[in-house]
Amino acid sequence: MMSQTELLRKKSHPVDQALTPEEIQQYLTVLDGWSLQGLHIAKSFEFKNYYQTIAFVNAIAFIVHTEDHHPELEVGYNRCVVKFYTHSVNEGLGGISENDFICAAKIDALAGNQFAPMSH
């Protein structure tokens, strides 16, 4: 199984097939706080204030633009929920791919280094 460090070194790339449910569960064990929510992997990040939340969203925008793999974001005053899903896999039916986990790992690294989510 791939480690978070190995995911950080990878770059998103075109894929045709989604991961199997077993593969998804294996990847979820590598990333802290991410969970399967319907057809997405998702994680909620909390911040001290609106400014930190929006700074985090802007930093995410840079990462996902570079990776060419864009999440759905739910943004509130002090919270951002990030959801990944790959629309292009399974002949356009969609699913979860390694690209979702690559980007999730990069967002976790960003949050851990610069935006440290508040503990509950």
From Swiss-Prot:
- Enumerate the SUPFAM superfamilies for this protein: PCD-like (SSF55248)
> Mind telling me which InterPro entries this protein's record contains?
PCD_sf, Pterin_deHydtase
- Keywords from the UniProt entry: Lyase
Under the heading Gene3D superfamilies, the entry gives:
Transcriptional coactivator/pterin dehydratase
Q: Name one GO molecular function term.
A: 4-alpha-hydroxytetrahydrobiopterin dehydratase activity
Q: Which reaction does it catalyse?
A: (4aS,6R)-4a-hydroxy-L-erythro-5,6,7,8-tetrahydrobiopterin = (6R)-L-erythro-6,7-dihydrobiopterin + H2O
Biological process per Gene Ontology, one example term? tetrahydrobiopterin biosynthetic process
Q: What is its EC number?
A: 4.2.1.96
**Coiled-coil ranges per the record?**
none
Q: Where does the UniProt annotation place the signal sequence?
A: none
Q: Which family does it belong to?
A: Belongs to the pterin-4-alpha-carbinolamine dehydratase family.
Could you tell me what this protein is called?
A: Putative pterin-4-alpha-carbinolamine dehydratase
The organism encoding this protein is Bdellovibrio bacteriovorus (strain ATCC 15356 / DSM 50701 / NCIMB 9529 / HD100)
